[in-house]
Swiss-Prot record:
One of its GO terms (molecular function) is DNA-binding transcription factor activity. Transmembrane segments: none annotated. Probable transcription factor. May bind to the promoters of target genes, including micro-RNA genes, in order to repress expression, and acting redundantly with flh-1 and flh-3. GO terms for biological process: negative regulation of DNA-templated transcription; nematode larval development. This is FLYWCH transcription factor 2. The keyword Zinc-finger applies. It comes from Caenorhabditis elegans. The keyword Zinc-finger applies. Disruption phenotype: Knockout causes a nearly wild-type phenotype, but a few young larvae have morphological abnormalities. In a flh-1 mutant background, L1 larvae have severe morphological abnormalities and/or appear necrotic, and 100% die before reaching the L2 larval stage. Embryos exhibit significantly lower expression of lin-14, and overexpression of micro-RNAs, including lin-4, mir-48, mir-241, and mir-34. In a flh-3 mutant background, embryos exhibit significant overexpression of micro-RNAs, including lin-4, mir-48, mir-230, and mir-65.
Amino acid sequence: MVDTMMNTNTDGVTAVPPIFPLPSTTPNRNNNNELAMLAQKQIVAGLLLQQPTIVQAAVNGTNSQKHLADIDYTNVIQTLQALGTTNLKAFSLLLDPQSQTSQLISEDTRPSASSSPSSTATAVSNSGQSNATSTSSSSTEPEYKPRNVREKVYADGYIMSFDKKSCCGTKEFWRCERKNDCNARMHSDINTREIVRKLHPHNHEKPSPEELAFYEQDFSTLHPNYCHPVKSINRSYMQRKLSRASHVSQALPIAPQQIKAEPMEVDTTNQTIQNFQQNNNLMLLASINAAATAAAAATSAGISPPVVGQKRVSTTVMPITLKSQRTTPKEEEDSSQLMSQEEFRITYELTKKLMEMMKPKTEIGVRWQGDEGSILLFLSHDNGAEENVFFPVVVMNRDEKSLITALEGFTGKRCEGKLALCYSQRVNVLVHEALISNWTHGKLFLVNTDAPALWRLTPVDAFGEPLNHV
């Protein structure tokens, strides 16, 4: 029975209509379009007629070259060349064995597809596979990631940003997310994400709990020696959110339960109210007495009471209400700190005495009974010792020459350069007559003669500390 059906189907196949031959003369553009449309229709009709026979032969395993020989490929190639000369778009067909209908899938606008005959044949034969491939590939497309967004991880309490992979392909390099300010770097294993090396410590504090809350992840359970992926959050966006939240929290009003008056303020307010009530009562009593006195005086003077139609004059004096000046706790504290004149004088005298006692002794109190033009100084060698012994030296005249002569006699050396006062390591002032004339008796100096070109005198106080004035 199967053989009978196969013979019947084979005998019932209609012959393929011939392809419209290509004319020898070159037609105009309109004739080319009509020719291409007619050739296209005939190719589709021939393929549809061949489809049932080809499918049945493939199912029974009796497929042969018999049916393929019915198609004139020479005419097909000539027709496709005609399509290419008229610049028409190539087309592809999807042949469905079940529905036995053709469906137009896509059109390619590239000229290379229309100029090549093999490309059109390949599109027709592989149209079914391309549709299935496109459907399966759409479901397995990778997740879209925007450009210039690097992966971020949480490692050792900090947020790190991906930098690059090593040339050997076994390590990943990470940088601190504040890469413009912080130079910290880190290397991790590419498979286990374990930290294998740390370079350059961070120059900032670890992210605060408020900043970590943006990542919506519990970081307390994570191992500090591994890299844990986190969401990629823009740091400037995070800072704006935190700044706005801090401003809002500062602008919120204080709850009534949080407002508690200080004891001093409560007592002061109660006392002010009591004083105001007492003053008001006294003023009211005085006004009543004044009104009674005025009424008695009017009666004794014979003044008749006002009659109807006249304007009544009120003899009642209303009490004057004075607005109390409420003082703040700060004003009361300032007023309580004010001293009387006597207390201020005593405090001033004590402070003056203390300042005089604390003032460093820059000279030794001596009574000079010699010549008024000479001066008595106490000199010691500046040799870096902790204790210095000062010797009295008399300068005969208040000038530089006499001072150098006295120093040469004290040191036993000859001064071949200048003489300067050393106030610090950087400040040296040359000695001159106007400076020496203001000196008083008993001043202390350390003499340094290490540099022959410049001898230095360092003024010190009674404790051996250098002075910045003489």
